[in-house]
């Protein structure tokens, strides 16, 4: 089988260092599924991991995938051969930038039947990140009526995570405020369901006042935590909660959180599979809920760009686009 990877970390300005490798098709055992990959999504985490030291050569990146189960391990109980599934994988194994992939069943769910593979591939990583942030971190209710009156600010509402998080939060009853700046990103965020879209290039505090927003219960930062840290502390309500998926690049003063008793959390969606937590089955459960909501028409996919064919050039192009920070929604590569 073909896989696209690299032997050592590299920056894009060093040239295209992706290479094509050929491996034997693996055999599933235990709770493993052998999936023939149809479509993958490229995420910012891929571009970050490309620049990190390589422990095992070659390094094959990729998390989001949609594909067909070709074989199952002898302990698999939730799936059968021929099922079309989607997932976001685990940092503990080779990624989805390959024709066949082994994946454990508790990280997988059946893909929405009303979506093409290139549409469904946009949902797992960002959807899981949003579900974990909203339900596990913020602790919102799964009963929409119980979230009435609660508000959420999403920094970078038109990105992949912000796009699906907006839809999920709206379905579960939150008032959603997002940030964007370009005409196309503002329109996109509104289409995703945002109640208010603020211009991140202007003073957010003043825009809160202009829109009669006294503060928000939750803030979900999906872009440059350092840039927004003090502003988020100012905008969150007392005893509110801030979560980020972007690591700090410099030291920040946690004492700023004290006077409001604000909770600050780093959300890392891969913590469960990385550390084999007892509740790792939540990935399956959350993905299953995403599938149900998509099939019922409540969520829509966030794919905005599709590249046909997985090879060294298409993957390099995808990484270039991601690093330009101009993407709205998600970028997908079809293997078919």
Swiss-Prot record:
<comment type="similarity">
    <text>Belongs to the zinc-containing alcohol dehydrogenase family. Quinone oxidoreductase subfamily.</text>
</comment>
<dbReference type="InterPro" id="IPR002364">
    <property type="entry name" value="Quin_OxRdtase/zeta-crystal_CS"/>
</dbReference>
<keyword id="KW-0862">Zinc</keyword>
<dbReference type="InterPro" id="IPR020843">
    <property type="entry name" value="PKS_ER"/>
</dbReference>
<dbReference type="InterPro" id="IPR036291">
    <property type="entry name" value="NAD(P)-bd_dom_sf"/>
</dbReference>
<dbReference type="InterPro" id="IPR011032">
    <property type="entry name" value="GroES-like_sf"/>
</dbReference>
<keyword id="KW-0560">Oxidoreductase</keyword>
<keyword id="KW-0479">Metal-binding</keyword>
<dbReference type="InterPro" id="IPR014182">
    <property type="entry name" value="ADH_Zn_typ-1"/>
</dbReference>
<dbReference type="InterPro" id="IPR050700">
    <property type="entry name" value="YIM1/Zinc_Alcohol_DH_Fams"/>
</dbReference>
<dbReference type="InterPro" id="IPR013154">
    <property type="entry name" value="ADH-like_N"/>
</dbReference>
<dbReference type="GO" id="GO:0008270">
    <property type="term" value="F:zinc ion binding"/>
</dbReference>
<dbReference type="GO" id="GO:0016491">
    <property type="term" value="F:oxidoreductase activity"/>
</dbReference>
<protein>
    <recommendedName>
        <fullName>Zinc-type alcohol dehydrogenase-like protein SE_1777</fullName>
    </recommendedName>
</protein>
<dbReference type="InterPro" id="IPR013149">
    <property type="entry name" value="ADH-like_C"/>
</dbReference>
<dbReference type="Pfam" id="PF08240">
    <property type="entry name" value="ADH_N"/>
</dbReference>
<dbReference type="Pfam" id="PF00107">
    <property type="entry name" value="ADH_zinc_N"/>
</dbReference>
